[in-house]
């Protein structure tokens, strides 16, 4: 009985989220927005920053709870022009039903963790300095390295979707002010910069529902460092355990 009720609950939730996956499901760039036609049905666009590159490949999770860590399907789009200007990314990572995404947790050194709402959807957000050595988007629009070591400052927004099989990550970046090497001890006067940066980040993305979508083609863009599309950026997963008490 409990198993039957669980099935009915899942079916009802899927209908609310936009219907079951089918052969017609598409995910990728359409009209300069990332579109997923189901699970969930969503359209995400970046405001005021031109599209640079994007496509589909796989992530590499190393810290999953069990042996045989998953290699999620990763759809990602990058928006930006150069390392002196803002940059934004949209990432949708999907695991198979052997796994589920854990709750969103901040990266080491992150600050200002909070819940925010973008386009009516709830996200967990935090701000951090991007380490260039393992940045999956390093070099796509260049790196802010003028006048010595420098970093991107990033505002990271993430939410789990589709019964925790999917995770949507929105990230907005700007070149960090020169001399900013840590967010826990900002030089005097830079706390105001961080606050204003976070406000700009929240306005960078628009969410909606996809309308009629034409054919989407996904390639594997070579300029994204897929080997670093790992736990540090994507987050971690846990393996589903069988319920031996289920009737």
Give residue spans per PLM region.
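Bacterial N-terminal signal peptides
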Residues: 8-18
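Bacterial N-terminal signal peptides that target proteins for export
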Residues: 1-9
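N-terminal targeting sequences that direct proteins away from the cytosol to non-cytosolic compartments
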Residues: 20-75, 181-247
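Polar low-complexity intrinsically disordered regions enriched in Ser/Thr and small residues
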Residues: 15, 22, 83, 112, ...
